[in-house]
UniProtKB/Swiss-Prot annotation:
UniProt GO cellular component terms: nuclear speck
GO biological process: anterior/posterior pattern specification; embryonic skeletal system development
Localization of this protein: Nucleus
Keywords: Developmental protein, DNA-binding, Homeobox, Nucleus, Transcription, Transcription regulation
Source organism (scientific name): Mus musculus (Mouse)
Gene assigned in the entry: Hoxa6
GO molecular-function terms, A-Z: DNA-binding transcription factor activity, RNA polymerase II-specific; sequence-specific double-stranded DNA binding
One Pfam family it belongs to: Homeodomain
Region called Disordered, residue ranges: 88-126
DNA-binding region: 154-213
Function recorded in the entry: Sequence-specific transcription factor which is part of a developmental regulatory system that provides cells with specific positional identities on the anterior-posterior axis.
Protein name per the record: Homeobox protein Hox-A6
Sequence similarity: Belongs to the Antp homeobox family.
Entry coiled-coil feature ranges: none
Positions occupied by motif Antp-type hexapeptide: 135-140
Length: 232
């Protein structure tokens, strides 16, 4: 059994009388791994309490410490912006990156939703729905200068007139019970109505006027008859 360090409990010479060769063995041969420690159960350690490390281990440990220290010592000024990342050309990224060339995000920043991006997406979605939504006939405005848009089927709704429109139509009917096409167009443009609506209103107004005149004439005729009978 050979050992890499001297054990004082083990005799310095063999029973066969040969010379002591344990002291001639090198403590650290060429195949010794400096990174792997040996347990203390092999014997009392007479070597000084010193750690032998290789230069490559120093370089590796420094880079590891730099990475760990950089993740805690970075402030707000060390973060890269999106413009810096997007402006960098891909051809210029051939050099090896250091530990500080990468972005560092906290878990809250990684999983936190971006309110501005979501608000912009919702706004664009709302505008798309606004222009692509179908317009049904019942959604159109009936009192419009361009005319009411009705469906190809179904019953047309009854037109309602404002007090101003009714007053102006009554004035026109008082002077002219029948309108020419030119005058009808002028009134339609002035009252924000269609020619058809003006035409229908005058037709209904003439029917009402005829009924009123017939009722007046009938009452006058009945009154004259009663007076004639009373005179006899």
């Amino acid at each position: 059994m050979s050992s890499y360090f001297v054990n004082p409990t083990f005799p310095g010479s063999l029973p066969s009388g040969q010379d002591s060769f344990l002291g001639q063995l090198p403590l650290y041969p060429a195949g010794y791994d400096a990174l792997r420690p040996f347990p203390a159960s092999y014997g009392a350690s007479s070597l000084p309490d010193k750690t032998y490390t290789s230069p490559c281990f120093y370089q590796q440990s420094n880079s590891v410490l730099a990475c760990n220290r950089a993740s805690y010592e970075y402030g707000a000024s060390c973060f890269y912006s999106d413009k810096d990342l997007s402006g960098a050309s891909p051809s210029g990224n051939n050099k090896q990156r250091g530990p500080g060339d990468y972005l560092h995000f906290s878990p809250e920043q990684q999983y936190k939703p971006d309110g501005s991006v979501q608000g912009k997406a919702l706004h664009e979605e709302g505008t798309d729905r606004k222009y692509t939504s179908p317009v049904y006939p019942w959604m159109q405005r009936m009192n419009s200068c361009a005319g009411a848009v009705y469906g190809s089927h179904g019953r047309r709704g009854r037109q309602t007139y404002t007090r101003y429109q009714t007053l102006e139509l009554e004035k026109e009917f008082h002077f002219n019970r029948y309108l020419t096409r030119r005058r009808r167009i002028e009134i339609a443009n002035a009252l924000c109505l269609t020619e058809r609506q003006i035409k229908i209103w005058f037709q209904n107004r003439r029917m009402k006027w005829k009924k009123e005149n017939k009722l007046i004439n009938s009452t006058q005729a009945s009154g004259e008859d009663s007076e004639a009978k009373a005179g006899e």
